[in-house]
């Protein structure tokens, strides 16, 4: 029948949108009507269907006068099923095993094998963790660690691998602690460790320190919204402040659902928990071998830390010997260019000897950043404007910083990390006159973060070595140069604007009282800000307490005169912050490679307590309040007007959404028959109702999620919203049939996977030119072909590692910390970072094990739309951006793995370039190259210099191909 185009389009719209149908029994609309048995429709083409799914798909296609696409090639199918079920491409041997099996059962056997593969759980747990808003930190200010959240991630992986019935999976996460029967008058039955870990689901929302009723209201509201959207596919959270704008969910129903969680409480914070995020509950390791694994891991961590400490001690001794021989510095003016007009001197440093240098600064402005000084008391500094001296002290207490004469001067603080305080400020050459003292009345010190000069030079070297060092060519004016030799000092020279730096400014006039001088010495500690002025010749001396840290202070002198500055060898004072040397400019005496090695060892030691804490048998779970006489009874739940915690309305009792039940009567809650635990069983009642086969939503929602994750789009396009905004299902009867299949097969998710991937619908090709179908159904709602889609971010990273041969396939365990890009790694290195960068195999496990820090998403994964969830995420965005190309071609991660991929090919294919290219295609794309592809990549490899990098370049091209990044 040839229908006019407009009529044909209208017919398609009527078929595809499948407007919401009514249930004749009680006039409730889909999806609130019960799931009932559905008859599989007859097939217009009996040869095409492989199972019931295909009958429903073919019925809609036939009505729209469309036909399904041909089956995909075996090479496409084997790659598709591997990436779909385990998130990794097949090896050439695995692909060949399937391609060479011509039996009718080859596909079904492969599907069963992959569903039994432990990598299946690692792949599919990622989708559930997005729903559960999983993260390893709590978010908000400080983003505190949730040290035991990783156990929930392993619980999900293990549950999926064991094909735990989905109804049990629901009950454990909502009320795992309430399903033990109360058999007598004894103690309350304890929940098992697996159930305690499972209830981490309720705890995973971003959480700040509790603020009484407000925090509790927000916590319970978030739990209510998440449970409703994840398990029921309802946006109940939209009714928190007012009746739902689109669905029949009144505000009253939101708080009736919230009442099921009214007895939830968070464990008390652990001792020393400055963030007050709440503690953990005991939960022994329960999986086979997990207890032994934890003990072995503790021993490994301790052994690694002990080895790192011994190596650090050896390195420090070696560096002290290198650094401690000589010390000195040079000064050079900023003019039209660098010339040899610096003044330089040096002296032997012996057990803390001090080095002093002087330079003329007539008409120039200099900025001195003084660092690595504990303190040194020098005695009088009076004397000429030029000269040098040194002292030998074992335990310096404070330091003299500066002399100027014949002009005005200003002193600027260049940093604010001074842990102690200024103890004294002196005018040292002569007793202060009354006039001089009148100019020193205001003494305050304003703390500021260091802001280095915007132009100038920073020298950490003997200046005479600068010209001889080929790594420090003469820069243009206004640029900075830094270097190290075996002579340690520190100075920044700059023509700076004083406004660019935190200030200890010259202040004239009257000022607030409170600090005074008695003779030569300051009486009392300085307040927050220190400013002073003198117009007379003499030595300005600032005396620090011994708590001065390595960050340093800067002092600036402008105008006519001279300035004297003193430095002390940083190692001679025996400072505990010797490690801070690595935070300075690159060293030539201590190479960059040595610095990196030292930093890695220091991190091993620093992160040990963090990892050991994670290995305690605990879970980031919730608990129920025990009620009288131990704790308060069941709180009264009230509607909160406009969602405001302090604006109570009517009292409500726990109950299910009236749009589903048809009434708003309270739920039946099976209370303790001995009346000792009045707070118990509320969440159990909710979990039992959600997990019941009679619930019209639960099975439909999870069946739709699996369909969405297999095809890229659900039968209901909005997986967590089955309400009116979803526009209903495209194949209503099919979704009901899938839901019925799930419940009849003991809620087995693997049985539903098996049903979907064994269908002819799933096995269609994605590359099918059908202009008529493309015009009629451009979004492929009727599934006349398979949907081509890009791999998720985690699958991209895992596939790159798998193809290079470097993927660590160890299952379960602590979070991992892969290397970050250099700019981000430098930024987090000197903060209170939680990122313990792992450069070895432990950092190359699958992406599901990566530490999920809410304030630090891995840039490579973020580029491919990965998220660290603050809320439940039912689906990922799939963007196409230039950044993805750059990440796959220029990132250090892909570059390294391309080199290893090329080496893997060389090892297996020999030295022949043609054979190497052919094998690279088999490994990356599961097929042989076409003649044109073979020719192009061989030409690229041959033209690349050096010659050994040719195959590396070819492998990088394969990583960047759409075929590698997409599932066909």
In which residue ranges do the predicted regions lie?
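Primarily short, surface-exposed interaction patches in extracytoplasmic proteins
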Residues: 45-79, 84, 89-119, 134-187, ...
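Extracellular carbohydrate-recognition regions
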Residues: 172, 320, 324-327, 445, ...
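Sequence context surrounding c-type heme c attachment/ligation sites in exported
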Residues: 178-179, 183-299, 861, 873
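Extracellular glycan-recognition modules
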Residues: 182-195, 321, 328-339, 351-353, ...
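Extended recognition patches within non-cytosolic domains
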Residues: 248-252, 304-314, 421-459, 468-470, ...
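Extracellular glycan-interaction patches encoded by glycine-rich segments
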Residues: 335-338, 344, 390-423, 429-432
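Solvent-exposed strand-to-loop "edge" motifs in beta-rich extracellular domains
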Residues: 359-362, 463-466, 543-549
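Short, solvent-exposed beta-strand-to-loop segments that form ligand-recognition rims
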Residues: 370-398
